[in-house]
């Protein structure tokens, strides 16, 4: 029996401690990314306003790409987790090798799409004075896509084994290097040239390369990974494994991409209302990221645990982990949400001096609290489905929840009904809760089918 699963039995009533042990390192790693986003925005914004605007456009584009790319690589986790639970660790190396090739090919597809977009940047209605800033920053970010693919592959492999601390330390180290690099290259410190936005891009590229190398280095030198290292190097590519990775990866990529695109389109709709609502919306998106990193981190831990128990054919524990993960997410949302709710009249002032913005933020925080139930539900059971390798239905469910229900409802309430930004935000709880309930019902249906 693997050390990670020795103490796990169907008699165990709850799995909170084990979920936290795997989930907290994921959350800490993601917290570093959020802090990096704050630092990037702060440093670029203090250098110049046009650079901040240019960075916002490019970062939104690459954010959508990286969310989708990461979603594709998620296909590896249930494969590794199932084999680990079955104690068939001798098969893991071949799966990782095939996943690496599939992930690199997918990275090339994303890169090609971004090259096409780069060649058409002048046609998407951006101010001419920003294009000279956007283009070099875009190219430097483009150079990092495949390195992120390497990092994602190694992360999902190690996460599948329950080794989530490795990626946590790599991400923390990469973020520290990025912040220091920003300081040196944006402002021209210690004899380096003052590169502004381009310096921020170069710093990001270097940190992503080092993160990828750190993960590969851990695999190649770590004492605990000798068996996997040998199997990865000696194994061969197979059509069946390559197809399996694509079968599991693309639905998750599409599901996460649609979720991200729906929020981006909501931001566009808020922009139609003017500067004040858009500023309030940006404050709320920043706040919601803090909830996101906790909910998604715990949900990722749940997917790992569920895949392990699927390998052991312990379906009682599969169900218990899913619902324990949901309860933990609700508890975290409550613990984080209570101080945010109590400080709702002060929080807007931390970000902006405008009283209208602060009033909008105070009201929108109430809606943010309401949609935490639906957000926790959909993160939990989307990852539970990922853990049991049932991912195709999520594409349809995400399309229905976000593009058939949430976006049209937000538009209808916001504009024809005259509720403005409040109407757009009222739609979020509906879309997220409906998505979560569809995922939950599908999880129960698939699990009952497997149990028979």
PLM regions and their residue ranges:
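N-terminal transmembrane alpha-helices
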Residues: 11-42, 46-47, 63-75, 79, ...
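Short runs within selected transmembrane alpha-helices of multi-pass transporters and secretion channels
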Residues: 73, 77, 141-159, 167-175, ...
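Helix-terminus/linker motif at the lipid-water interface of multi-pass membrane proteins
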Residues: 31, 35-53, 121-128, 184-195, ...
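Hydrophobic residues within alpha-helical transmembrane segments
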Residues: 24, 28, 58-61, 101, ...
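Transmembrane helical elements of multi-pass membrane transporters/channels
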Residues: 21-40, 140, 174, 207-211, ...
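Alpha-helical transmembrane segments and their lipid-water interface positions
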Residues: 33, 37-40, 44, 66-73, ...
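Small-residue-rich hydrophobic transmembrane alpha-helices
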Residues: 52-115, 148-167, 267, 280-344, ...
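Short alpha-helical transmembrane segments in multi-pass integral membrane proteins
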Residues: 1-23, 80-146, 192-250, 306-371, ...
């Amino acid at each position: 029996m693997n050390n990670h699963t020795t103490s796990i039995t169907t008699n165990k009533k709850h799995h909170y401690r084990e979920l936290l042990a795997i989930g907290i390192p994921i959350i800490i790693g993601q917290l570093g990314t959020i802090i990096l986003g704050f630092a990037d925005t702060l440093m670029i914004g203090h250098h110049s306003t046009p650079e901040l605007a240019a960075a916002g456009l490019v970062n939104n584009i690459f954010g959508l790409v990286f969310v989708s790319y990461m979603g594709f690589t998620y296909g590896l986790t249930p494969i590794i987790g199932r084999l680990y639970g079955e104690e068939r660790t001798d098969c893991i190396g071949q799966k990782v090798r095939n996943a690496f090739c599939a992930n690199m090919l997918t990275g090339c597809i994303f890169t090609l799409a971004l090259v096409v977009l780069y060649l058409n940047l002048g046609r998407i209605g951006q101010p001419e004075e920003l294009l000279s800033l956007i283009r070099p920053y875009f190219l430097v970010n483009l150079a990092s896509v495949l390195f992120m693919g390497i990092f994602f592959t190694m992360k999902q492999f190690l996460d599948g084994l329950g080794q989530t601390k490795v990626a946590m330390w790599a991400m923390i180290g990469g973020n520290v290097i990025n912040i220091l690099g920003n300081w040196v290259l944006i402002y021209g410190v210690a004899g380096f040239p003052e590169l502004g936005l381009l310096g921020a891009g170069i710093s990001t590229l270097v940190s992503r390369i080092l993160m990828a190398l750190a993960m590969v280095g851990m695999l190649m030198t770590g004492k605990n990974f000798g068996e996997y290292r040998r199997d990865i190097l000696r194994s061969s590519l197979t059509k069946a494994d390559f197809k399996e990775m694509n079968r599991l990866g693309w639905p998750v990529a599409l599901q996460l991409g649609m979720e991200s695109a729906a929020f981006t389109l909501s931001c566009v709709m808020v922009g139609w209302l003017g500067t004040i609502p858009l500023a309030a919306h940006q404050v709320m998106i920043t706040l919601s990221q803090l909830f996101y990193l906790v909910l998604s981190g715990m949900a990722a831990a749940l997917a790992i645990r569920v895949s392990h128990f699927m390998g052991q054919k312990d379906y009682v524990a599969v169900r218990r982990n899913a619902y324990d993960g949901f309860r933990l997410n609700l508890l975290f949302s409550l613990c984080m949400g209570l101080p945010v709710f109590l400080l709702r009249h002060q929080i807007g002032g931390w970000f902006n001096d405008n009283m209208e913005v602060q009033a909008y933020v105070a009201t929108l925080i109430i809606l943010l609290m309401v949609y935490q139930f639906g957000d926790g539900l959909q993160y939990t059971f989307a990852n539970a489905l990922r853990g049991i390798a049932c991912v195709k239905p999520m594409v349809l469910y995400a399309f229905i929840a976000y593009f058939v229900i949430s976006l049209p409802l937000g538009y209808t309430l916001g504009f024809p009904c005259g509720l403005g930004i409040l109407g757009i935000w009222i739609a979020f709880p509906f879309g997220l809760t409906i998505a979560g309930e569809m995922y939950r019902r599908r999880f129960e249906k698939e699990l009952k089918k497997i149990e028979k």
